[in-house]
Regions:
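N-terminal Rossmann-fold NAD(P) dinucleotide-binding loop
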Residues: 198-199
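NAD(P)H dinucleotide-binding glycine-rich loop of Rossmann-like/cofactor-binding domains
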Residues: 94-192
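Glycine-rich beta-strand-centered segment in the early N-terminal region that forms part
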Residues: 23-37, 50-97, 102, 153-157
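Active-site-adjacent beta-strand anchor residues
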Residues: 33, 60, 86, 166, ...
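Adenosine-nucleotide cofactor-binding segment
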Residues: 188-194, 203-243
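Nucleotide donor/acceptor-binding cores
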Residues: 3, 81, 186-187, 211
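Short N-terminal strand-loop motif that marks the start
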Residues: 1-64, 138-146, 150-152
Length: 243
């Protein structure tokens, strides 16, 4: 099918909106019409070749949208479902079998190399192969092919175009607090940097019952937002000694 995608063709270059051809979903794949996508530093790292993803490539790994088609083996979602797309894991290595997909042994190959695990590309333009499958999605496009494993169904009463960051930034910040730190009620939490990940960590601190949540940043607008989200103290290290 023909879609429009933001194609990155060179290191540090611009995103170019181009018409490309996207495969039909394979038996374990899900075709999603993208409603919204977050822009993460990891996308910019791939653009700048801090991670060696191949060009030309369609980036984007915080996508959300509506399922349009599914492969015959897909059971978790159906056409019309609202979904958030996240990273993809192999599902077969030791960590994956223990439910720890976030440390999948094949994570780099599955998320950064621009192709399906079998090496095939999902997109092309004329006779040119376009690398995709970035984090198992490449959501800087009107449509994305994802795997059933990295497609998460969400309620349809929430604006789907706002949910993309759940796939990376929000789960990174909130998950780091809830699952890794696991703070007890009444404990203190310091968050250095209050971008999307840091703000998510603050929200998780509130959820966990932290009595003191300290936000540290050099931008006054972010510190103001951090207070609104639950930070009890804010520090701008340019204006005061954070120690």
């Amino acid at each position: 099918m023909k879609i429009r995608a933001a194609v990155m063709r060179e290191k540090g270059g611009p995103f170019r909106i181009e018409e490309v051809e996207l495969d039909e979903p394979r038996e374990d794949e899900v075709l999603v019409r993208i409603a919204g996508a977050g822009l993460c530093h990891t996308d910019l790292a791939a653009r700048d070749q801090l991670v060696p993803s191949p060009f030309p490539i369609v980036l984007g790994h915080e996508g959300s949208g509506i399922v349009e088609k599914i492969g015959k083996r897909v059971q978790k979602v159906k056409p019309g479902d609202h979904v958030v797309l996240s990273y993809v894991a192999c599902g077969a290595c030791g960590p994956c079998r223990k439910g720890m997909e976030h440390i999948c042994l094949n994570s780099f190959e599955y998320n950064f190399m621009g192709a399906r695990p079998d090496g095939s590309r999902t997109m092309r333009k004329g006779g040119e192969k376009i690398n995709g499958s970035f984090f198992g999605q490449s959501s800087f496009a009107t449509h994305a092919l994802a795997n059933e494993r990295n497609t998460v169904k969400v309620d349809d009463d929430v604006p789907i175009e706002r949910l993309g960051p759940l796939g990376c930034g929000i789960q990174t910040g909130a998950g780091g607090v809830i699952n890794a730190l696991s703070p007890k009620p009444g404990s203190s939490l310091a968050v250095f940097g209050t971008g999307g990940v840091g703000m998510s960590a603050i929200l998780a601190g509130v959820l966990c019952g932290c009595s003191r949540i300290i936000a540290v940043d050099v931008k006054e607008t972010r510190l103001k937002a951090a207070r609104e989200l639950g930070a009890t103290h804010v520090i701008d290290p340019r204006r005061s000694d954070p120690i």
